Amino acid sequence: MTRDDALPDSHSAQTFYENYEPKEILGRGVSSVVRRCIHKPTCQEYAVKIIDITGGGSFSSEEVQELREATLKEVDILQKVSGHPNIIQLKDTYETNTFFFLVFDLMKRGELFDYLTEKVTLTEKETRKIMRALLEVICTLHKLNIVHRDLKPENILLDDNMNIKLTDFGFSCQLQPGEKLREVCGTPSYLAPEIIQCSMDDGHPGYGKEVDMWSTGVIMYTLLAGSPPFWHRKQMLMLRMIMDGKYQFGSPEWDDYSDTVKDLVSRFLVVQPQDRCSAEEALAHPFFQEYVVEEVRHFSPRGKFKVICLTVLASVKIYYQYRRVKPVTREIVIRDPYALRPLRRLIDAYAFRIYGHWVKKGQQQNRAALFENTPKAVLLSLAEEEDF
């Protein structure tokens, strides 16, 4: 067992060990490890986040105190939002001089990131379910003036029924009325333009809850396209793309999606925060609207006849389009296999199956490194403007 795998000694964490039996590691953070654990009285499975506030002994006393206060703030926010069906539930907490133990529900399906790596891209139907639940969570947070600041697929967990649970509130903050934030935190490819601007301009007024909506747009784009809208191997170029709001619904990956879903994504990815779509506004967008059951079932004779006529016309049109479809020849497949949707999905799926394991959590790693759909024209124009 390496030092990173070692557990806190039983003497300092006696109360925790009396109630829980820690098992294998599920994930790691900068100063924390997440393990599966068993609640001894009930044999129920949970996940415990073990936070070393000393950084393995490398932190100064000021850094230890800062991390301790940040952890207590995370616990406080989790308790304030307790009970929401799409937020991870904090079941128990333990504290020693050097460690925190935060016990959560165990989400066996893992992260949305891993599910996306397996599926490559999601359909509009799957995306609608996930994004509606995420936006409802954000509505709840923002009504309490809580900004998450680290929304990304790695921090969205899935239960056995594919329902989401938002987790990792380590960067979260509850704002006072009129308060603005200035500190730079989060994951680079999900940062809102105003966060980056704060790091470059001492006179910047700061940012607020709108940063979560930008990250939501990046998540939604990523679910549909398979890679984020802003990415470059040179991080400075990527940050420049974010600040300029330069992204595209490129072909062929966006050819099969509706204009409605593209419109919603574009309402999130607006550089000016005051013009960005809020969570409540997004939930009212046509992408999330459903037919009212009573209205659907109410047919008039005239309406029935109209539906029959339209169905016949559509069937005839589909039939003739099918008859006119050119056969896929060997030459077409050799020349541009990626232009054919079935082959495109097959190629992407096998690429992720072979290489997806190394595209994971590090800030220098990104899905786009493996599944690069970013239009080259955008990158070239940026490179010409400024040499990094």
UniProtKB/Swiss-Prot annotation:
Keyword Cell cycle: no
Keyword Lyase among record annotations: no
GO BP term (any one): glycogen catabolic process
Residues annotated to bind ATP: L26, G27, R28, G29, V30, S31, S32, V33, V34, K49
Signal peptide: none
Domain Protein kinase residues, every copy: 20-288
One of the record's GO cellular component terms: phosphorylase kinase complex
Transmembrane segments: none
Region of interest (Calmodulin-binding (domain-C)), ranges: 343-367
Reaction(s) this enzyme catalyzes, per UniProt: 2 ATP + phosphorylase b = 2 ADP + phosphorylase a; L-seryl-[tau protein] + ATP = O-phospho-L-seryl-[tau protein] + ADP + H(+); L-threonyl-[tau protein] + ATP = O-phospho-L-threonyl-[tau protein] + ADP + H(+); L-seryl-[protein] + ATP = O-phospho-L-seryl-[protein] + ADP + H(+)
InterPro entries: Kinase-like_dom_sf, Phosph_kin_gamma, Prot_kinase_dom, Protein_kinase_ATP_BS, Ser/Thr_kinase_AS
Assigned keywords, A-Z: ATP-binding, Calmodulin-binding, Carbohydrate metabolism, Glycogen metabolism, Kinase, Muscle protein, Nucleotide-binding, Serine/threonine-protein kinase, Transferase
Region: Calmodulin-binding (domain-N), residue numbers: 303-327
EC number from the UniProt entry: 2.7.11.19, 2.7.11.1, 2.7.11.26
Pfam families: Pkinase (PF00069)
Enzyme active site: D150
Highest taxon in the source lineage: Eukaryota
Domain-related comment: The two calmodulin-binding domains appear to act in concert to bind a single molecule of calmodulin and are pseudosubstrate/autoinhibitory domains.
Subunit structure: Hexadecamer of 4 heterotetramers, each composed of alpha, beta, gamma, and delta subunits. Alpha (PHKA1 or PHKA2) and beta (PHKB) are regulatory subunits, gamma (PHKG1 or PHKG2) is the catalytic subunit, and delta is calmodulin.
Function, as annotated: Catalytic subunit of the phosphorylase b kinase (PHK), which mediates the neural and hormonal regulation of glycogen breakdown (glycogenolysis) by phosphorylating and thereby activating glycogen phosphorylase. In vitro, phosphorylates PYGM, TNNI3, MAPT/TAU, GAP43 and NRGN/RC3.
Record-stated family: Belongs to the protein kinase superfamily. CAMK Ser/Thr protein kinase family.
Protein name (database record): Phosphorylase b kinase gamma catalytic chain, skeletal muscle/heart isoform
